[in-house]
């Protein structure tokens, strides 16, 4: 609890001027979870917890003039494997590590579509327009992407350039972080700064409402 409290205090002090909505819990000596920061007032909020998983999605409701919309902030199941560790295991012919890796990948491949369907059902029942963003841990050829882009545009496709890779450890191969928005709007810009804050690069998008 103390770790979560410290994380919440840090967020509130670091991002003054923003409304911060978050769901955090202690993990590995720190805190893990989702955070949504907004300069707009938050008129409603909620979370979608995934069964037997540390991952989740949160959402916030906002008003801009006479328009009301919801923003989903998603973090879907990852493979939870170390690429360096896998490479070393292959080099050593370590069957135990390879078997563990296979188990983790199978678990992720099974869980992620279930999580996606859970969020999609919530989106379908949402009474207002919805924007969807976050770490999908899946590529643009996946079921995850196909499902989440239904009825929405991909900001990178509309306004980005290059490969659009967001995962730094396999740059420029993987684009697994997305900003999706209703089809009637337009993405003005899309940028992925290569900054060393995380193993993921930030995705910065400007959308004309």
Each PLM stretch: what is its role?
Residues 1-64:
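Membrane-embedded segments
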Residues 2-5, 106-114, 170:
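Soluble non-cytosolic domains of exported or imported proteins
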Residues 2-6, 28-31, 54, 79, ...:
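Active-site environment of divalent metal-dependent phosphoester hydrolases
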Residues 6, 10, 32, 111-114, ...:
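Extracytoplasmic/secreted proteins, especially bacterial periplasmic and envelope-associated proteins
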Residues 18-19, 67-69, 126-129:
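Loop/turn elements at helix/coil->beta-strand transitions in domains of secreted/extracellular proteins
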Residues 38-43, 53-95, 185, 209:
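Beta-strand-turn-beta hairpins that frame and shape the catalytic cleft
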Residues 96-107:
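Short glycine/proline- and acidic residue-enriched helix-loop micro-motifs
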Residues 113, 120-130, 136-209:
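Metal-dependent phosphoester-hydrolase catalytic domains
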